[in-house]
Each structure stands twice: as C-alpha cells, then as structure tokens.
Amino acid sequence: MSDYYEILGVPKDADSDEIKKAFRKLALKYHPDRNAGDKEAEEKFKEINEAYQVLGNDERRQTYDRYGKEGLNGAFGNDFGGFDFGDIFDTFFGGGGFNKSRSQRYDDAYDLDSEILVSISFKDAFFGVSKDIKYKIKKPCKTCDGTGSKDKKLNTCPYCGGSGKIVKRSGFLSFAQTCPFCKGSGQIVKEKCHDCAGKGFIEEQVNVKFDIPKGVNTGIRIRIAKKGNISKSGEIGDLYVAVQVKDDKFFVRSADDIYIEVPVFFTQAILGKTIKVPTMHGEKELQLKVGSKDKDQFVIEKEGFENIRTKIAGNLIVQINVQTPKKLTDEQIELLEKLHESFDKTADGIFDKIKNWFK
C-alpha cells in the first residue's frame, strides 16, 4: 500500500483539519453507495479509511511518522486495519446505517473495551516490570437494571419512531444518522434513575496485576482479556494498557539501540586509553582508538534494548565528548610547549601542502 499521506493527498506537515477535509472529500467520492459494484472504488475507499484511522489519531500518526507501518503493527497490534463502512458516518455525520463493532452496541451506552495509560521509567522499559494498577470500569446500574429509568421502563423515542436513526439529505445523497435524542437506541426514559443519573451504568474502581515485558516503547498497547467494561448482557470487554516510557537523564533510545555521550579528557582520546562507561547493566570498559576525535562513536554490542518480537538485543553506542582544559599551570604549559615543538615538522609539512594547493 502507498504512503498514507499520499493516499489522502496531503503533505506530511498537514494539520488535523487538512487531514479531516481530505478524508471527507475522498471518502464521499469513493463511497460504495455512489459506486455500486465498483470493486476498485471499494478498495480505494478502504485505503482512504485506513489512512485516516492512522493520520487522524495523534498517537498513531506519531508512531507512523517515526517507524512507518511496521511500527504501527507492533505498537497497536494491527487493531486499526479493519473497519466497517459506518466509520465515515460516525466521524462526520454522527453514525450510519451500518453495523457497530463489538466494542460498542446500541444497547450499551459505553464501549466494552477500556484503555488506561501507564507511565514507566526508562529502566523498567529495559528490564520489564510488574504492575498493580487501579482503574475504573463501567457496569450496568443494578437499581435500574441498566435502563437509566427510575421505573426500569423504556419508551419509544418520538423523534425517530424507535428506529434509532434519522435520515438526512445532502444533495442527491441520503445519510442515515444516529438519532441524537436516543443515541441510536430507539428508546428514551421518562424519569432518570437517581443512582446512575439516567446513564444506565455506574463506575467501579478495580485493580489488575500484569507484566510489562522488557523492550517496550512508547505507543505499545498491551491487551488484557476480560478486564474491561461489562455490558447489560454480562459480556466483558478487554483492557488495553497504553505504555508511555519516560526519558532518561543520560541514555537516549533509538529503536532497539541506546545512545550515551561520555566526556573524555583530550589526553585519553589522543593516547587511546581505556575508559569506563555506564551501561544499563553497570559499568563496562571501553578501549578508545589512538587519536580519537570529538564525537567519535564506539559500539558495545548487545547492550541495547531486547526486541519484543525477535528477542535480539540492540547495541549501546557511546559517543565521546573530548574535553580540553581551560586553565593550565606553568608546568603543564611547559610540557605542552615541548609536545608542540615535537610536532612542528609535521605541522610545517601539512602547511606546505595547503600552500601548494593554492598555486
């Protein structure tokens, strides 16, 4: 599939409004209702919808910009790939005449699946960590049996006649929009339940214990089955844990590799001394090359993050920051002068080459 930005015909720095407008225009153009029997238009419509599901979501867009589609597959478990044709109406017209996914049904006022954000340290992301988190789930109100009505009775919505939809026209197109009064249920309550304020559900605090595997990065979602919201029929959704990894003071992550900048005295760099560098597993020795320069990089293999899928560890890249003294004693100046004199012939030879270049 082409680049998502190319599919929607927008630049990579497009803002959310530009992306939304481009999606709406293309989705209306290629919608199956306007292209009955046209398989090519149907495939194009699917591509457009998938592109918008990524670019229209800030978190997914950031992951896509950084890692491409492969990064989305890892970070979001490919949960954005499927769609139904009602998505376009849900986004722009408040609902459509298509089936809802399992996540939300017309007889429930909330999604079955729930999501929480968990922030962890750089160290916990490297080694993995166990968590015990408190969060809230939605469940049917027992007082009104999930109806939201004081007398537990529901009445037919007078605005949509119980269909749950209101038809709107735009030019030669007709759109079935979710009824804004009954929220698509086709039913309303006369007097609200006091315990749930007419919502039909209450929120309850629960806790869950789970493991975050080593190697996770910001954007990863962990699915915990049967720990989400509860429907009136007793069906339980899943809990999705969105992981956010905090930045470290010294280490910087790039994919599975870790970067660190280490200060090195100029004599250590020139002489190629052995230095000690911090790693996630503790200090390790690193042999510098003779004549090392500022910003030179050295690789310590297998000291990076372990890849969640392949279980292969990345590397630690050490970049040296060569330090030179700002103040010198008389003795140090004398020693450096002697060292400089010993290199005079070499320096003169280099200067002669530069002069010859201009002739």
From Swiss-Prot:
Q: What is written in the cofactor note of this entry?
A: Binds 2 Zn(2+) ions per monomer.
Q: One of this protein's Pfam families, by short name?
A: DnaJ_CXXCXGXG
Q: Which domain of life is it from?
A: Bacteria
Q: Where is the J domain?
A: 3-68
Q: Does the keyword Cell cycle apply?
A: no
Spell out the subcellular localization from the entry: Cytoplasm
Q: Which cofactor does it need?
A: Zn(2+)
Q: Where are the CXXCXGXG motif repeats?
A: 141-148, 157-164, 179-186, 193-200
Matching entries from SMART domains are given as: DnaJ (SM00271)
**Where the protein is mainly located, per its record?**
cytoplasm
Among the GO molecular function terms of this UniProt record, one is: heat shock protein binding
Gene Ontology biological process: chaperone cofactor-dependent protein refolding; DNA replication; protein refolding; response to heat
Comment, domains: The J domain is necessary and sufficient to stimulate DnaK ATPase activity. Zinc center 1 plays an important role in the autonomous, DnaK-independent chaperone activity of DnaJ. Zinc center 2 is essential for interaction with DnaK and for DnaJ activity.
**Subunit structure and binding partners:** Homodimer.
Return the similarity comment: Belongs to the DnaJ family.
Q: What does this protein do?
A: Participates actively in the response to hyperosmotic and heat shock by preventing the aggregation of stress-denatured proteins and by disaggregating proteins, also in an autonomous, DnaK-independent fashion. Unfolded proteins bind initially to DnaJ; upon interaction with the DnaJ-bound protein, DnaK hydrolyzes its bound ATP, resulting in the formation of a stable complex. GrpE releases ADP from DnaK; ATP binding to DnaK triggers the release of the substrate protein, thus completing the reaction cycle.
Kindly provide the name given to this protein in its UniProt entry. Answer: Chaperone protein DnaJ
Species for this entry? Campylobacter hominis (strain ATCC BAA-381 / DSM 21671 / CCUG 45161 / LMG 19568 / NCTC 13146 / CH001A)
Q: Gene name, please? A: dnaJ
